[in-house]
Amino acid sequence: MKPLVSPGLAKACTGLSLIGIVFLLVLSYLFSIEAETLMHDLVGSGLTGKQVAKTCLGAVVIYAVFFLFCGSQVIVSRYQKPVRI
């Protein structure tokens, strides 16, 4: 099986996806406990902290899919035999 993206791009995508997952999980937790620092931005919007936390978790799922795809590309490129001419 050939990788779809280069190894460098796959590693960068994997790293950024992991950072995004961690960041969004922290934001989701803070919105779910309705941290005062974040909640004042929601005043007048009609949104609750729980709704925003669910949205953050939805984004975590998307980032997790990218993490799995890019991580699989790193593994595939690691085991690919070099082309010999």
From Swiss-Prot:
Transmembrane segments: 13-33, 56-76
Record-level Gene Ontology MF annotations: RNA endonuclease activity
Bilayer disposition of the protein: Multi-pass membrane protein
Pfam families, sorted: V-ATPase_su_f
Taxonomic superkingdom: Eukaryota
Cellular localisation: Endoplasmic reticulum membrane
UniProt keyword terms in alphabetical order: Endoplasmic reticulum, Membrane, Transmembrane, Transmembrane helix
Record's GO cellular component terms: endoplasmic reticulum; endoplasmic reticulum membrane; vacuolar proton-transporting V-type ATPase, V0 domain
One BP annotation, GO: vacuolar acidification
Known function: Accessory component of the V0 complex of vacuolar(H+)-ATPase (V-ATPase), a multisubunit enzyme composed of a peripheral complex (V1) that hydrolyzes ATP and a membrane integral complex (V0) that translocates protons. V-ATPase is responsible for acidifying and maintaining the pH of intracellular compartments.
Subunit text: V-ATPase is a heteromultimeric enzyme composed of a peripheral catalytic V1 complex (components A to H) attached to an integral membrane V0 proton pore complex (components: a, c, c', c'', d, e, f and VOA1).
Protein name per Swiss-Prot or TrEMBL: V-type proton ATPase subunit f
Source organism per UniProt: Schizosaccharomyces pombe (strain 972 / ATCC 24843)
Record lineage: Eukaryota, Fungi, Dikarya, Ascomycota, Taphrinomycotina
